Amino acid sequence: LTVELILGDCLEVMKSIPDKSIDAVITDPPYGMKSHNMRLAVSMMNNDWDENPASDEQINTILDIGKTTVIWGGNYFKLPPSRCWLVWDKKSFDKMTFADCELAWTNVDATVSIFRKSPQNMDGGKVHPTQKPENLMRWC
């Protein structure tokens, strides 16, 4: 197993990565929550972290470099058809906000998967506005 850590601006670094050289790309790119007029918590409205969605070029680069790709918020981008969408069902969790579920596009040839486990490690507070629970990421 070879692991290489690269420090840099991902938008610049991705351009130099050879096609299909990354075993798994799991990403949650900005999809322009403000530009979609989504309901936002007051604390998020004052931040510009998600002002502009990822461009088609950036999404295509993600698709090019990954062998297996998972794109959270994939329903906001122009992506190829997929049989295997991941669905994070958030309805039953009192502390969740915004949507009842979150969708992730994948290039995996499998059936749709629905994640319903409790996000147990979210009680300690978030360090990122779109943070995913650890058990959800393990499930990916």
At which residue positions do the language-model features occur?
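Class I S-adenosyl-L-methionine-dependent methyltransferase catalytic core
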Residues: 1-139
